[in-house]
Regions:
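Conserved alpha/beta-hydrolase catalytic His-Asp/Glu region
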Residues: 109-115, 125-185
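Flexible "cap/lid" loop of the alpha/beta hydrolase fold
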Residues: 85-90, 97-128
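Gly/Ala-rich beta-loop-alpha elbow adjacent to hydrolase catalytic centers
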Residues: 76, 80, 84
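Conserved serine/cysteine hydrolase catalytic core
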Residues: 165-212, 222
Length: 250
């Protein structure tokens, strides 16, 4: 009989391959494991709609229904932390545990009055960002020299029509998730936060006081020698904590 179900949610722009190492190790260990590309990323549809946390949450919930998964442990990386917070708020009965990895769910956001995306914005984004956006992915690592070719993988994403619009729309639809995160803390859902010790993309010290107020009962871990992607950069330490601590706790 398989162990518990793990659902891996990727971050802002890099799709499900960001979870490759952990997904494969989880499968080998006998966990039922699911990963997916959220709308606008990788192989999923590029929708002509607002890319909100709720859109992504409902996408995951629909997939769970399709696969007849009743409950799961969710691992949300970076922007994926926002998605798992929204899922837990909408459907807490689906949640076994929540694992936030380098999560951007706790930052401050000022709601935008206009969340539409114009053709000019898309063209400007492609012109100004596409030449360097792949190389910029290397900044997620503490030691980028150890991950040659990581940026080439990202370059393939730029060929998909609708990718730029999805990124712009997602950013424009970011709002504070204080209500959702407080709801989670007040629930009985086990919750964990995991951080790279040298993350320059989501800087822990910028929001740790807010996080301590919102989620004081969380259990927290820091992964050594890693930046924004501790699951990739120090997979040995990350997986030791995941399998031998987080997933073993009742």
């Amino acid at each position: 009989e398989a162990k518990n179900t793990l659902i891996f949610i990727h971050g802002f722009s890099v799709p499900s391959y960001i979870w490759d190492d952990t997904f494969k190790s989880a499968c080998k260990k006998g966990y039922k494991s699911v990963r997916l590309d959220l709308y606008g990323r990788g192989y999923s549809s590029n929708l002509d709609s607002d890319y909100t946390d709720e859109l992504f949450a409902n996408q995951v919930i629909e997939l769970m229904n399709e696969l007849k998964i009743e409950r799961a442990t969710f691992l949300g990386l970076s922007n994926g932390g926002r998605v798992i917070s929204k899922i837990a708020y909408l459907k807490p009965e689906l949640i076994q545990k929540l694992v936030y990895v380098s999560s951007s769910s706790f930052q401050e956001h000022k709601p935008m009055n206009d969340t539409s995306v114009s053709g000019k914005e898309i063209n400007d984004f492609i012109k100004n960002n596409y030449p360097s956006i792949s190389k910029g992915q290397m900044l997620d690592f503490k030691y980028p020299q150890n991950f040659k070719g990581w940026d080439d993988k990202y370059e393939q994403l730029l060929q998909y029509e609708g990718f730029a619009r999805a990124l712009i729309s997602t950013r424009k639809n970011h709002v504070n998730l204080d209500l959702e995160n407080k709801f989670i803390n007040d629930s009985n859902i086990p919750l964990y936060t995991v951080w790279g010790d040298s993350d320059s993309a989501v800087v822990y010290n910028n929001f740790k006081n807010k996080l301590n107020k919102l989620m004081p009962r969380r259990i927290e871990y820091f992964i050594s020698n890693s930046g924004h992607l501790p699951n990739v950069e120090n997979s040995v330490e990350f997986e030791d904590i995941l399998y031998n601590k987080i997933l073993k706790e009742n």
